[in-house]
Amino acid sequence: MIVCTGVGPGHVDFLTRWAEELISEADVVAGFDAVVDVVRSVIPQSAEIVTMGYKDQVAKLEEVARAHHAGKRCVVVFMGDIHFSGFQLLERVERACGHAVETVPGISSAQILASRGRVCFDETTFLTLHRRGDLEPFLRHLVHVLEDGRNAIVIPRPWDFMPKDIAAWLVARFVSGEHPVEVWENLTRSEAEWRGTLGDCTRDFSDMSIMLIRTLTPMASQIESA
């Protein structure tokens, strides 16, 4: 058996009961170091822990796949929710196993940020840049999102395209630098790490950051008047 599950945005309090049950009954728990650390208190002492990084993930997932094919209960843990951000890792798991695997949803950092920032997804678009390959199509989509008067929640690419790079790219494409921006690094806190405008977003943030770019003109309420 092998299952891939999201574990929430970085704190065990956001772990779903379904994911907790899977992890607590696993023979093998695998994932990137920071993700495994989130659920380490739930992993049974009898379980084998397989941690990985960007450079050795293919070899480590092949190790997990061998355990799966040997009949062990394997759980691969993902930060947030797999289908919000992490689909390329899921592809690697399935390639190693040679078949499609079951996925279990988690709570995404985008959902927590929407709650913290008090924005709703009918007025907000979510984009993840946390992927390998060409980002240009996704960035062009981000420009259209902002031109359409919507908010944007954006997960940066931690190794080379962070909030300051996103802001600089947008401003260079004539997106107004006056868009209000929030960057969050720890979503268990009640306040953003940084608030300002797109034009002022020039500082460095950790690889756990997520960005909210607000529309210049918030949508008016469409509920009936009191």
Question: What positions do the PLM features span?
Answer:
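Class I S-adenosyl-L-methionine
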Residues: 1-104, 112, 200-201, 208-212, ...
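Short gly/pro/ser/thr-enriched loop/turn and capping motifs at secondary-structure boundaries
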Residues: 36-38, 57, 108-112, 132-134, ...
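Short loop/edge segments at beta-strand edges and connector loops
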Residues: 53, 105, 128, 185
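Short, glycine-/small-residue-rich phosphate/pyrophosphate-handling segment
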Residues: 114-144, 148
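Short, well-ordered secondary-structure micro-motifs
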Residues: 42, 87-88, 113-116, 137-139, ...
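A contiguous loop/helix-start segment that scaffolds small-molecule binding in enzyme catalytic cores
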Residues: 2-4, 72-74, 82, 146-226
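Flexible, glycine/proline-enriched loop segments at strand-loop-helix junctions
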Residues: 78, 100, 125-130, 151-158
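Short, structured loop/turn "capping" segments at alpha-beta junctions
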Residues: 103, 120-125, 176-181
